[in-house]
């Protein structure tokens, strides 16, 4: 039986009364973490957008996917202050059902958009380096715009149904919880739905990303072995290092939450977990969701170290700010022509061997 009061839903559950007994440490740890994620994520992604925006006319596939990822991260960061207030109040939401649904919508949009656009980026890099001729048409800007549009439509189809679900619940303690797992427990076939969401929203994308980047690493290792100049320059090693960093960030941020969710849903299909197990799951969810949200503030750092053009433009911007502060002129060398904001170095054809030219082209494609 359910009763409603002041736009909030109250479940008639007197079974579990200890689900938020960890609020003592959570109301300090979670606000601190989310405040850090909000500040770093917002500043980093706004800076990334500031670098990308003036160069939209020179945009290419990599930049376009990255721009969509940046927009998603910014929208998510703007909603985090409300979550900080919620956690600081000890899991108590004072802002109504409507705002709770809006914050939940932005949270899940960011999660699915982040996974999908990271997958698109991995496939884009795979095509650029491993299959540059056969599938190059899928890297044309016009087609990539359509792909981005389809991704957003799919993400909205995945998340908009949340607006029809109750997001808040009045606990026996009087606290009003928002976007907590127990608030969804009365949804029919919830374990099956969430297992399907984990497989489609995380399992398939992570396999795609691992396959694409593994193929990239193998290709780069082959290029380094067949071209001593490339191996000596260290460019292939740097590229492989960047790829490993991207994979590590993705796996560390997204895997704990989805693995945690998957194991508990499988457990629910077998039997009904008791209050102790549900409480442990609640604690693990709060921690793993926090890790997953770290991804939004780590993306700008990946752009900085992975993309030469982005790094150069950020450093130039910082030098400009320093020069203005100290009323001094810092002269920098003019930038060469660039295909896009992430700096696709112009390849100069010369009389060197074909293998060296091919290695340079593929490595430059990876650094876009």
Swiss-Prot record:
Chief localisation class: membrane
Membrane topology: Multi-pass membrane protein
GO molecular function, a single term: oxysterol binding
The UniProt record lists the keyword DNA-binding: no
UniProt xrefs under InterPro entries: GP183-like, GPCR_Rhodpsn, GPCR_Rhodpsn_7TM
Localisation per UniProt entry: Cell membrane
Extracellular side: 1-27, 92-101, 165-189, 263-282
Protein name as annotated: G-protein coupled receptor 183-A
Organism the protein comes from: Danio rerio (Zebrafish)
Lineage: Eukaryota, Metazoa, Chordata, Craniata, Vertebrata
Gene: gpr183a
């Amino acid at each position: 039986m359910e009763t409603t009061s002041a736009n909030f839903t109250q479940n008639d559950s007197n079974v579990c009364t200890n689900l938020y007994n960890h609020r003592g440490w959570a109301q300090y740890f979670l606000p601190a973490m989310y405040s850090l994620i909000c500040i770093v994520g917002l500043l980093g992604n706004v800076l990334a957008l500031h670098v990308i925006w003036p160069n939209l006319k020179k945009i290419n596939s990599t930049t376009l996917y990255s721009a969509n990822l940046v927009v998603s991260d910014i929208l998510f960061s703007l909603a985090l202050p409300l979550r900080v207030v919620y956690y600081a109040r000890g899991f108590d939401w004072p802002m109504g059902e409507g705002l709770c649904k809006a914050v939940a919508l932005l949270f899940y949009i960011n999660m699915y958009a982040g996974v999908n656009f990271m997958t698109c980026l991995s496939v884009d890099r795979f095509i650029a380096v491993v299959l540059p001729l056969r599938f190059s048409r899928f890297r044309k800007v016009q087609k990539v715009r359509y792909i981005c549009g389809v991704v957003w439509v799919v993400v909205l189809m995945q998340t908009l149904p949340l607006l029809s679900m109750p997001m808040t619940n009045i606990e026996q303690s009087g606290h009003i919880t928002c976007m907590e797992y127990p608030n969804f427990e009365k949804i029919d076939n919830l374990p099956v739905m969430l297992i399907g969401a984990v497989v489609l929203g995380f399992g398939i994308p992570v396999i795609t990303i691992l396959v694409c980047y593994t193929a990239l690493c193998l290709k780069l290792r082959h290029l380094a072995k067949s071209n001593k100049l490339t191996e000596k320059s260290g460019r292939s090693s740097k590229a492989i290092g960047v790829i490993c960093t991207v994979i590590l960030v993705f796996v560390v941020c997204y895997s704990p939450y989805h693995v945690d969710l998957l194991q508990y849903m499988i457990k629910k299909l077998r039997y009904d977990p008791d209050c102790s197990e549900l409480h442990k799951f609640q604690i693990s969810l709060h921690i793993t969701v926090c890790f997953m949200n770290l991804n939004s503030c780590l993306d700008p750092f990946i752009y900085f170290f992975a993309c030469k053009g982005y790094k150069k433009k950020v450093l130039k911007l910082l030098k400009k700010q320093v020069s203005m502060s100290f009323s001094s002129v810092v002269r920098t060398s003019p930038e060469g022509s660039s295909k896009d904001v992430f700096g696709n170095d112009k390849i100069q054809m010369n009389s060197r061997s074909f293998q060296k030219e091919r290695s340079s082209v593929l490595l430059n494609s990876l650094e876009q």
